[in-house]
Amino acid sequence: MQNSTSKVRVLTGTAMLGAVAAVLMYLEFPIPIMPAFVKLDVSELPALIAGFAYGPVSGILVCLIKNLIKLPSTSTAAVGELFNFVMGALFVGVAGLIYKRNKTRKGAIVGALLGALVMAVVSVPYNYFIVYPAYVVMYHLPLDAIIGMYQAINPNVNGLLACLLVFNLPFTFVKGALDAALCFLVYKPLSPILHGRK
């Protein structure tokens, strides 16, 4: 009976965190040092909380739920949502797996930072080979025009790969680190609620 109650709590918590993450996806804002089409949100925060509280699978499910909710209103033909899911799943999957094996503050920090690093590194080839070529086709936007948006900020970058390495790689890592920092601020107060403790 207790095991059944625990499973229900995990499923309910995962679903609720997925809904919160979906709302946070809409609360995005531009960053002055990035091209206007690159925006910051903290929608991985609930997924990271789920990954720490319930395990990596729950965190990945939160990433899936938020993107499925966002899908009907997408303007990217699901390319952006698929990218968001893959990156988020890598981030919270790595973080949750490491924390599951080492449930200490150090384990959480190492897991979150390593997850952010993996997400940032993988984002470069994913953007280079899939996302940006898809956007070029979908929006009939020349690749040179996209590169020009980066060069308007830093004229020294030449080529898409350089743009991704100089701008997107550190941005994605910092985004993950920000989610991690926020998680460490709110996780302890939320933990009793997530685990059904008073």
At which residue positions do the language-model features occur?
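Loop-helix junctions at membrane interfaces
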Residues: 1-198
